[in-house]
Every structure is written in C-alpha cells, then in structure tokens.
Amino acid sequence: MTSENPSGAGNQQERPLAAEWVVGFVDGEGCFSVPIFRNATCRLGWQVQPEFAVVQGERSVKVLYALQTFFGCGLVTVNHRHDNHRQDMWRLGVRRLDDLVRHIIPFFEQYPLLTAKAGDFASFAKVVRLMEEGFHLQVEGLGQVASIASTINRRKPSQLLESSEAIRQPPDIDVPGEDMVLASWRHGES
C-alpha cells in the first residue's frame, strides 16, 4: 500500500536508494576483504579473492536486494548461522573482478566513505587494480598483494595473523620464489 506522503515511512522501502545513504550504510555495515588461501589449482598455489560484502539479519534482507539492484551486481545468499536475535544472517557479496572494477570501485571513488573504512577501501581498490593487471599471478606481485591485503580490516595483532594455517603451511607444489612470497606476506613487506 502506497502512502499519500511520498517521503512517509510507508514508502521508505519503495524509493530508490540515494548514493549518500548507500555510503553511510556501507560505512556502518559493509566490509572490504581480500582473503588469500591455498589452492593447488592456481599457478602459484594461492588464490586471491577480493570481496565487497554487506551482512544483515533476516528481517532486513530487503535492503540487501535493494543494494544488489543499486549496484547492478552481487549475489544475496543466506547463512544459517544466527545472530544474537536468532535470525538467519543474509549477505550480499560481490566477488567478480569485473563487477568490482566496473561497479563497486568507481562508486566509492565518486562517493567516498567517511569512516576508517575508507582506508580499507583504498587498499582493497589497490589490490583489485593489481589483479586486473595480473600482478597476483607473479611471485613478486602476489607478495605485494598479500602485503596490502594484510592491512585491511586488521583487528588482530600481526603475530596472530602469522600463525594462520594459510600462512604457516606452503602449498603442496613446488613454486620458484615461493619462500619470498611467504616471507613478505608474514612480515607485511611489499
């Protein structure tokens, strides 16, 4: 049912999202991440998977679909892990490199984030650009990507990051220069 008042509470879910609102919402609820994990099928034995994500409880899932429409990309999925309100958690995730390059990065460059998340975005965008050029497929480039990725969403002291299984155990393939990549990743060098 549509209200006579176009800005009334009844029409809040029907209106298209405003860019400024999206920036504020992502500042509070969004995440830019660059996980790097072992994958023997990749040339260097490591896979880099940058992702922009927003997570909400089941009662707010409509906003994720609105963001998906707004950006023109991404996948909304359910995770049956419950939050403290016993709801399923839903997430909008954008992983396709082309979608990140064409939709997500240009938007946040035009409408900058206002919190500390702006720094995470800058590092995230740098990684995506390096990947677009194929740097993550070279030993030195993978080390550079890993170094930049280690600065994103850093809430743990570096010694905890160093103890991660993905960092401790090299892939089960012989890659020339692999030790250099792992060493630069462990120590945050580029």
Residue ranges and their predicted role:
Residues 1-190:
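Sequence-level preference for short, compositionally simple segments enriched
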